[in-house]
Structures are given as C-alpha cells and as structure tokens.
Swiss-Prot record:
Enzyme Commission (EC) number: 2.2.1.7
Any one Gene Ontology BP term: isopentenyl diphosphate biosynthetic process, methylerythritol 4-phosphate pathway
Enzyme class: transferase
Binding site for thiamine diphosphate: H72, G113, H114, A115, G145, A146, N173, H284, E359
Record function comment: Catalyzes the acyloin condensation reaction between C atoms 2 and 3 of pyruvate and glyceraldehyde 3-phosphate to yield 1-deoxy-D-xylulose-5-phosphate (DXP).
Protein name: 1-deoxy-D-xylulose-5-phosphate synthase
Family affiliation: Belongs to the transketolase family. DXPS subfamily.
Length: 618
C-alpha cells in the first residue's frame, strides 16, 4: 500500500498524480473500514480526501499552517501526518482524536470541535507571523455550513479589512450536518450553477491540468476568471469583503487543485478565497445518497440497541404537543436529525426553523417569536448551547420569555472527546435568574417535563444524555410536573443520595448494592436543579447524617454546589460529599468506560459511599 510509505507530507510530494489518485482510493477504504467499526464522521471525511492531499502536496506543513474548521473532516490529514499506524484507535479511549488535537501532532495547529472558529484563528496566526517578521502561508479550511456562523462572517469582515496574506479554502458540499439553509447557501448555489460560468470553468480546468502550462498562463487564467465572474455575478460578495475570489473548482480533481493552489501560493500575498465543490460521502454509495445520515455514525456496538433514544422520544413527543398547541414552534441550529426535530419538520414544516450553524441567532430569534406570543422550543446539543450564553441571559431570561431549551447530549458523550462533552450546562445555566432547569430520570419523565415546560410562562431548560433511554414504558398521555418538585425514589435512613437526570437509575442500583451490605440509603430524584425543592430537601438533610450528590456534570457549580449553598443558607452544620466530574476536560472514550473511570456507575457510586461511611466511623 502507498500509505505505508507516507510518514509525513514530505513523502507525499514524491508521488506522481496517478499515485496520488491511487492513494486517495486507499485512504477512502481505510476511513470507511475504521469508521464503520469505531464510529465517527464518515461522509464529511470521504468528501475531503483529494482536497487534503492537494493541500499537503503544495503547502509545506507544519511550517505553513493549515487551520481546520470543526476538524471532523480531517481524517485524511491525520493519515498522512504520521498517524496511519494508530488510525485503528480513532475515537477510542487513549487513541487518536476524531478532531484536530495539537497535543497529538505538530501538524495540528489549533484545537477545534465547534464550527466557525477557523477564520478567526487563522487571522491570529497570520497577524502574529507578520508582527514577528516570519515567512509562511496560513490556510484556513472551512465548510459552507460553518460559513453561516456569525463568528466566521465576523472574521471574513476583519480579514478583508486588514488585507492580510491569508488563504481561505471554502469546502462547499451543500451540507453541514443536514442540508444547508439561508441566503449564504443560495449565494453559493448561484456561483456553482451559472451555465456560462460552468462552461468557462470546464474549459479552463482542462488547461490548468496540463502540466506544461507555466505560471504566467496560470496567472493570466486567474485574472481572466475573476474578470468573467464580475460580469456574471450581480454581487460578488467575497470581492466586496476584500478577498480575491477564485472558483468554484472541482474538489476531487487532484491535478486541478494542485495547479490552483500552486498558482495562488506563488503569485498572491493578500486575502484569497478559493471555492472548491466536493461531494459529501463520495466513495460510499449509501453515504453519497443520504450524507446527513452518514455525517456521524455509531460504532458496531451502538447499532445493536433497540430501546428508543431520548432524542427519538423527545422528537415524537414534540410532534404530539405541536398538534395540541398551534403556537409551538421548533428551532434547530443545523441539526434537525441530530436533535430529533426532523419529525416536527415533516409534520409542521411552516412552524419549523433551521437557522444553520448560528446558535446565537437561534436563541434571539426564539426570543422574538416568544415576545410575539409563540412558544419556541430550541433543541440544541449541550456543548453548542454554550455559544449562545449571552443571548440566553440578555435576550431571554432578562425578559423571562417562555422558551423551552432542550439540551441533547448532556453529560458524557463518548467518543467525540473534550469539545463535545456536555458537562457544563447545569453549572452555567444555574447562575442565570429566571431560568428553570430540569433533568429527567428516564424517557417517560422527559415527555412530562417537555409538556410542563411548554406550559410554563418563562425560560425552561431540559437536559438529557445521548443514546437510548432506560427502557421504561411510555404513557399515552402527558402529566404536568410541579415546578421544583423532587421525588423520593427509595426511603432509607443511613445515607441520603441526591441524584439528578442520568444518574438517578445508577444511584438506585447503587442503593441496592448498599442494602446488600446492610446500608439503607434514601435515594432522591432531585429532578429540578432550579428551583430546588427546598422544603423536602431540608427535611431530608436534617434527618440524615451523610449527604451525597451524584451528577453527570462538573462538580463545580452544579448539583453539589446548589446543595452545599442550600445547607449553608439553612445554617445546617453538615458536610456534602460530591460524586461527579472533576475540574478538567474529559477525554474521549466509551460512555461506560468513562463513567467507570470517573466513578459514575452504580458500582463506583456504592464503593465511594461505603468508603465515606467507613471514614466517618473512624
């Protein structure tokens, strides 16, 4: 195999065009086999193989800085930068990351996992280079989906204004996780589809691939191309922002990409945007046909589960509630399938809004809808809601608007690693006035909390984990839950276990283990982090000598913080022992493994409580 000879991009430069094409086929096969076994981002990586090879063929990494947006499409980059022998460990505990990780390789310059960061980071690299008097190229690779994010557009504005030597590669595959939406997507489609421009592109691309053409003709072709675009397009947006725009080019045509990249690298030292079009999922029949379903796939073990996921239960429950309440509207930030809102979109398309990768806009858009009498439900991953923190405070909670925030992927989220763990939401939402925060113990309680939230006249956040529910039977009706009311699941006397959300069932099982050891705990489903059930909790705290909190969230500021503060306010002289996640970023790994490592399964919870009780006796 050719890949066995590639230890670094320097080895890549020794290959012929035909060998590069053969290498691209080898890489696709490795990516497909690895992702089907380990899980990961399939469609996006299959779409960037040739683009990545051409980039590393022309630019001199790691001296030249290639800054990836999101980083989920960089598997080829990893394979040709010395990590091929470890690629089988992709997204596994202790293995290589599914994203860009500077601690992993000198070729990974900027840690990433969220969309829209590459242009700002690349501009920082470029300006630092200039101020230090250094000479190298900075290339940012961003997808058309990520380009819809506000941060990316802010960076485009600044890059053009500063007139910095920086190359932006726009990887246009017409998808982010789901098909792209908005005016930017329409604008890029206009660039791709103009018939006269497409004729011109076909002609010049054939010329560009001729290796005998010199730099002079290449430079002439680029100037001619730009002149023709100005005649064809009513509003060449990127040019107005201060970029020299070239494209669209076929992102799977290796000789063409090499010619374009070389020409621009050697001839230009200003802001340049190179527009390449790629096919998401190319090389895998099913992924090409339905790329959104193959954006990120689970491992083989994950595919065997039959119990419905929390995402499915939420999505179908919202459809039921949408039928009951015509004022309910649903909003997602480019993730209708991932959040379960695709069910609602199919049933109520006029009441469904996909705003693209624009979490800040999603929240304030919801605020406007709520202010005018509607009931918005904003479904978003826990890790991505962080991006709209100011909007939640300033535009929603300050006005106490009736918006339901549904936080999917809360807690440990397995193999995507530190950028995607949903372990901070209990902490960062708890400090905001007027916010109700709840976490269901199971999928049935999720349905009732959703019903309760939609009927609540203020901001209401519901968080739940990734993956299947616990398998309880779902009722065919909704029941309103009293705001702030906890639930005593098991009554005991020796120790008080206060658990929330995904930790309630493990706490109950831990209680069963303790009972077998002659220890009788009281187990409480706290359910509402805010407001707390103060009356019930005060009574329970006073009647137990040992208090344990259990949460799948960082200990700082979450359930432990809330209970410790309550005890202090009530002037109760008792100690609280926290079980939760430490003050660190949690690595990638299987959920069950990580819960074991961090003491969040029933066995480790029971073990910890036994240890605490033994220490108290001593």
């Amino acid at each position: 195999m050719l890949l066995q000879k590639i230890e670094s991009p320097k080895d890549l430069k020794k290959l012929s065009i035909e060998e590069l094409k053969k290498l691209s086929s080898e890489i696709r096969e490795i990516i497909i086999n690895t992702v089907e076994n380990n899980g990961g981002h399939l469609a996006s990586n299959l779409g960037t193989v040739e683009l990545t090879l051409a980039l590393h063929y022309v630019f001199d990494a790691p001296k030249d800085k290639i800054i990836w947006d999101v980083g989920h499409q960089a598997y080829t980059h990893k394979l040709i930068t010395g990590r091929a022998k470890d690629f089988h460990t992709l997204r596994q505990y202790g293995g290589i990351s599914g994203y860009i990780a500077p601690w992993e390789s000198e070729y990974d310059h900027f840690a990433v996992g969220h969309a829209g960061t590459s242009l700002s980071a690349a501009l920082g690299f470029a300006k630092a280079r200039d101020l230090k008097g250094e000479k190298y190229k900075v290339v940012a690779v961003i997808g058309d989906g990520a380009l819809t994010s506000g941060m990316a557009l802010e960076a485009l504005n600044q890059i053009g204004y500063l007139n910095t030597d920086l190359i932006v590669i726009l990887n246009d595959n017409e998808h982010s996780i789901s098909p792209n939406v908005g005016a930017m997507a329409l604008y890029l489609a206009k660039l791709r589809k103009h018939p006269l421009y497409r004729f011109f592109k076909q002609t010049t691309q054939n010329l560009l691939k001729n290796s005998s053409i010199g730099k002079g003709l290449l430079a002439f072709d680029l100037k001619l191309e730009r002149s023709l675009k100005s005649l064809l397009l009513e509003n060449p947006m990127f040019e107005y922002l201060g970029f020299k725009y070239f494209g669209p080019f076929d992102g799977h045509d290796i000789p063409l990409l090499i010619s374009v990249f070389k020409g621009i690298k050697d001839n230009l030292s200003c802001p340049v945007l190179i527009h390449v079009t790629t096919k998401k999922g190319i090389g895998h029949k099913d992924a090409e046909a339905t790329p959104s379903k193959f954006h990120s796939i689970g491992s083989k073990s994950e595919k065997e589960k039959k119990v419905p996921t929390y995402t499915e239960v939420f999505g179908k429950a919202l459809v039921e509630l949408g039928g009951m309440y015509p004022e309910v509207v649903a909003i997602t930030a480019a993730m209708p399938e991932g959040t379960g809102l695709s069910y609602f979109a199919q049933r109520f398309p006029e009441r469904f809004f996909d705003v693209g990768i624009a979490e800040q806009h999603a929240v304030t858009f919801a605020a406007g809808l709520a202010k005018n009498g509607l009931k918005p439900v904003v479904a978003i991953y826990s890790t991505f809601l962080q991006r709209s923190f100011d909007q939640i405070i300033h535009d929603v909670c300050l006005q106490k608007l009736p918006i339901t925030f549904v936080l999917d992927r809360a807690g440990i989220v397995s193999d995507d690693g530190p950028t995607h763990q949903g372990i901070f939401d209990l902490s960062y939402l708890r400090l905001i006035p007027n916010m109700v925060i709840a976490a269901p113990k199971d999928e049935s309680e999720l349905r009732d909390l959703l019903y309760t939230a939609i009927n609540y006249p203020g901001p209401f956040a519901i968080r739940y984990p990734k993956g299947k529910g616990v398998g309880v039977e779902l009722k065919n009706r909704f029941e309103k839950i009293e705001i702030g009311k906890s639930e005593i699941v098991k009554q005991g006397r020796d120790v008080l276990i206060l658990a929330i959300g995904s930790m309630v069932y493990p706490a109950v099982e831990a209680g069963n283990i303790l009972r077998s050891e002659g220890i009788y705990p009281t187990v409480v489903n706290v359910r509402f982090l805010k407001p707390l059930d103060i009356l019930t909790l005060e009574e329970l705290i006073l009647s137990h000598n040992t208090i344990i909190t259990v949460e799948e969230n960082v200990i700082t500021g979450g359930l432990f913080g809330a209970i410790a503060e309550l005890i202090n306010i009530l002037k109760i002289n008792k100690k609280v022992i926290p079980i939760g996640l430490p003050d660190k970023f949690i690595e990638q790994g299987n959920v069950q493994l990580l819960r074991d490592i961090y003491g969040l399964n029933e066995y480790k919870i029971a073990e910890k409580i036994i240890s605490v009780l033994e220490d108290i006796k001593v």
